[in-house]
């Protein structure tokens, strides 16, 4: 049975950047949040090149900290551009599996992402589909972006062991985004890395 979760306690600093009170850490840089995400997660996983060479119909990204959803939004946007440029490509859909223990209230999420006009369409779509703070899996379909997001709300250490993994693996790429290890060491443990290894395609 689903249970109601504690929402994230956040404040916005003098620069308008969202800060997680529980971890005393920012969600992203206001000046370069989108560029940071593209550099660390999109380019860091070489996603555009991998998509071009992908022969399956779907690609699966798993993320260990949904936060404001910015990483998912940027990935959606990039995948939409990929599909528009390559309409006949065999890769048709992006699936993102993301976890979050302390979900933001939708108003805080919208406030946080309002500084990035380049993703305003994606933010609006996410806000329309954003689930209540109840434990479990919440699927959000974004058909215009050829993307589905399964947002798993709860403790990542309890959630990942629940994920069924085919013999050849489940996850094609990982977004590790759980605040700095010094601020949130629970998101950077050996047990978590063991689960990631279990779920990853080889």
Question: Where in this protein do the model-derived segments appear?
Answer:
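Rossmann-like AdoMet
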Residues: 1-62, 76-118
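A generic structural signal for short coil/turn motifs at secondary-structure boundaries
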Residues: 26-28, 161, 182-185
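Glycine-rich phosphate-binding loop signature in dinucleotide/nucleotide-binding domains
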Residues: 55, 165-169
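Conserved glycine-centered beta->alpha loop in an early N-terminal alpha/beta scaffold
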Residues: 65
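Glycine-rich SAM-binding Motif I of class I
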Residues: 68-73
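S-adenosyl-L-methionine
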Residues: 108-166
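A short SAM/SAH-binding and catalytic strip from SAM-dependent methyltransferases
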Residues: 156-157, 171-187
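A short glycine-rich, Lys/Arg-flanked "PGG" loop and its adjoining helix->strand segment in the class I
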Residues: 186-202
């Amino acid at each position: 049975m689903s249970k109601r979760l504690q929402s994230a306690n956040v404040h916005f600093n003098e620069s308008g950047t969202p800060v997680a009170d529980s971890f005393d850490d920012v969600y992203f840089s206001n000046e370069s949040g989108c560029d940071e995400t593209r550099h660390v997660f999109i380019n860091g996983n070489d996603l555009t090149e991998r998509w071009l060479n992908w022969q399956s119909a779907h690609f699966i990204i798993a993320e260990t900290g949904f936060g404001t959803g910015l990483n998912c939004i940027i990935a959606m946007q990039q995948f939409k551009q990929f599909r528009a440029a390559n309409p006949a490509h065999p890769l048709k859909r992006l699936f993102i599996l993301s976890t979050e223990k302390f979900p933001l209230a939708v108003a805080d999420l919208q406030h946080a992402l309002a500084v990035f006009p380049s993703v305003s369409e994606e933010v609006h779509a996410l806000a329309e589909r954003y689930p209540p703070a109840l434990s479990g899996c919440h699927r959000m379909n974004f058909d215009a972006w050829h993307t589905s997001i399964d947002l798993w709300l709860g403790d990542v250490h309890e959630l990942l062991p629940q994920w069924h993994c085919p013999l050849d693996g489940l996850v094609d790429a990982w977004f590790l985004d759980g605040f700095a290890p010094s601020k949130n060491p629970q998101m950077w443990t050996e047990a978590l890395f063991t689960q990631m290894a279990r779920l990853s395609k080889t």
